Each structure stands twice: as C-alpha cells, then as structure tokens.
A protein has these predicted regions:
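C-terminal motif of bacterial Sec signal peptides marking the signal peptidase cleavage site
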Residues: 17-19
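Acidic, Ser/Thr/Pro-rich low-complexity intrinsically disordered segments
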Residues: 21-25, 33, 37-38, 81-138, ...
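SH3-family beta-barrel domains
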Residues: 32-58, 62-71, 178, 182, ...
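Short, acidic/hydrophobic/Gly-rich beta-strand patch recurrent on exposed beta strands
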Residues: 206-208, 236-242, 289-290
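Active-site loop architecture of trypsin-fold serine endopeptidases
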Residues: 231-236, 273-287, 291-293
C-alpha cells in the first residue's frame, strides 16, 4: 500500500470515526463500554464494518479470542504492528485464585498508535469469555485480582492503519501483604492440603515459621471481628477483609494485641507469634488461613506469594521487528514456543 493511499484512507477513517463519536446514543449514555467496544461501535455506526479493512479488524478481534498463544508467566514480548493489515494477538496464561495480574504495554518513542488491551476469563462452560479488565493508550497498564484458578486471555489490538513496535509484559503479584513482619513466602514451612491427624483432615492454610514474639500483622485493611482462644488454634484473631470479601485467620499466637470491632490497616500488629493450641509440640509459627464468602477455606499461598521477577528481555534486536530478514544458516529450527526447550515444528 503506497504512502499516499494509506494517508488518504487514514483521513477518511479518522473523519468518519470522529463524526460518529460526536453522536451520543442511548447505549453510550447508559451502558459503560470498554475502549475496544466503543471503537468497534463507532466503526459500525460509520458503516466501516462493510468495508474490507473494517471487516478484517472486527474479524481479527474475534479470532484472537479463539486462536491464542499459550504463555508462561512472567511473560515479556516485543512485537510490531503493521499498518497495512488489521491484526490482533491473543495470549493465554494460567493464574491462581488470589493472584494479582499486572499487564503493561509500552510503545516505541514517537509512535502514536492507539492500542486496546482486554483481559478475559476463559471457562469451558461459558461462551463468550468473561471480560475482566481493559485499557487503551490513555493508560497502557492495569491490574486485577483473579477470583479463581483459571486460564485467562489477553487480547492486544491496535486501531486501524497504525504501525509501531511494542513491548508487552504480564506478571503476577500478591493481592495481600505478607502476614508476618520481616518475612516472605520463603518462611512458609507447611502448605495447603497437607494431611493432618493421620489423614483425618487436611491443612486448610499455610504455616509461616518465625521466632517467638515476631509480630503477626494485618495483611489487608479491615475490621477485627473475633479475638478468641480455641483448642486447635490456641490464641486466634479473625480479620474481615471487606475489600476482597474474605476473612483472614491468624492462629497459634503467643499474645493477642487487638480487640473485636477495632479497625486496622495493612502492617498493624495483631499479635505475636507462638505455638498455642494444638501446635504446642512444634516450633513457633503463624497458621494463616483465608475464608471466602460462600466458598469456605481457600489456599492462601497465591495471595501472599512474592511478585514475579521481571521477565527476561527478548534477544532479538528490536529494530529488526517488522522487517524481512534472511537466515544465514543452511538449517533453521522453527519451534513451538519462544524458548529453546520447546520442540521443533
């Protein structure tokens, strides 16, 4: 496509979309749309869905939800958008309940392309995928908390007739602060699901080992709902995390330092670590549990696990992206994924 033709097409598309964007509809007034949905609606209102390029853009958006690349987190990719064709990319990744997913996209300096980011939850029993979060070039970064162990999908799509290089990053982070002062997930010595009492019950939490008297701290802002002593948990504290709709359980404390009805902030000391209750024969530790409304106990580890380290940058020179290159070796391996350990095609 020549530069003059491309410039003319862009001007036509821009004028049509701008004019259409000024017309408020009942749907636009009363229904909140994602940036991608709003752009697609303006395409249709302008009649551009009846043009080849408009149809290709809408088809690419749907295709990215069905045909996507399976990636392992943390993930980073540098890519190139070509102006002469409509495109969209889909990335599938596995997440655990309680993990925060952080997504960001950066464009090369000088690029004015508008790019749409949309995250979805995939459920084999649900069609279409459930939208989770979205963004465009006004804020090319967002995060959300996973509500279940599930596969998610990120769609990345630029607007029509724009080109540019981009770098995409998808990383995981905890949704809660760590509940023991000065420690992290390395201090977890017993995990969810381990047999207890000769297999009569399962461990419904994680055990975080620390010296006696180490502060057990609020992992979220909330309200203290119960301060008690029980045969199994010993000295316990319950914290209602209203932001996430869950209760946090602190057990085997040596001392309780809060009262029912007390409001606490992240990092406030709730008690001191000990080995009360049925932990009398074990070293001092905090039993930390999470109970979600309508779900009961869930695995706390993904909620407090350390954030992913920054993913490795691609080894390909970014200036080569979008260009044709010739392979010098007589034989070149085409692999199923972007790492050496993937099988050859």
């Amino acid at each position: 496509m020549s530069f003059r033709l491309r410039a003319s097409l862009y001007l036509v598309f821009f004028l049509l979309l701008t004019a259409c964007g000024k017309q408020q509809t009942l749907q636009g007034l009363f229904q909140k749309s994602t940036p991608h949905e709003a752009y697609a609606r303006r395409l249709r209102q302008a009649g551009l869905d009846r043009t080849a390029l408009g149809r290709d853009w809408l088809a690419a958006a749907d295709r990215a939800l069905r045909d996507s690349l399976l990636v392992t987190l943390p993930f980073q990719e540098t890519g190139y958008f070509a102006a002469e064709r409509a495109m969209a990319a889909g990335y599938r990744y596995q997440v655990r309940e309680g993990e925060t997913v952080r997504i960001s996209l950066t464009l090369d300096q000088g690029s004015d392309a508008r790019v749409f980011l949309d995250a979805f939850e995939l459920d084999p029993e649900r069609r279409p995928p459930r939208p989770l979060a979205s963004a465009d070039t006004t804020a090319l970064a967002f995060s959300y908390v996973s509500e279940d162990d599930r596969q998610h999908l990120l769609r990345v799509q630029p607007e029509l007739l724009r080109a540019g290089r981009f770098t995409l990053r998808i990383q995981r982070a905890p949704s809660l602060s760590f509940p023991v002062k000065g420690k992290n997930d390395v201090a977890v010595g017993s995990f969810w699901g381990v047999n207890r009492d000769g297999g009569a019950r399962r461990h419904e939490g994680i055990d975080i080992f620390a010296k006696r008297g180490t502060p057990a701290v609020a992992a979220a802002n909330g309200l203290i709902t119960r301060v008690d002593e029980t045969p199994r948990g010993g000295l316990v504290v319950w914290l209602a995390d209203t932001e996430h709709g869950q209760h946090l359980y602190y057990a085997h404390l040596d001392k309780q330092l809060v009262q029912p009805g007390q409001q606490v902030l992240i990092g406030d000391t709730l008690g001191l670590i000990g080995n009360t209750g049925n932990a009398r024969t074990t070293p001092p530790h905090l039993h930390f549990g999470i109970y979600r409304g309508g779900r009961g106990a869930v695995d706390p580890f993904p909620f407090v696990r350390r954030a992913d380290a920054p993913p490795a940058a691609p080894r390909t020179a970014p200036e080569r992206l979008g260009q044709w290159v010739r392979v010098q070796d007589k034989r070149a391996d085409l692999r199923r994924g972007p790492v050496d350990k993937q099988a050859s095609v």
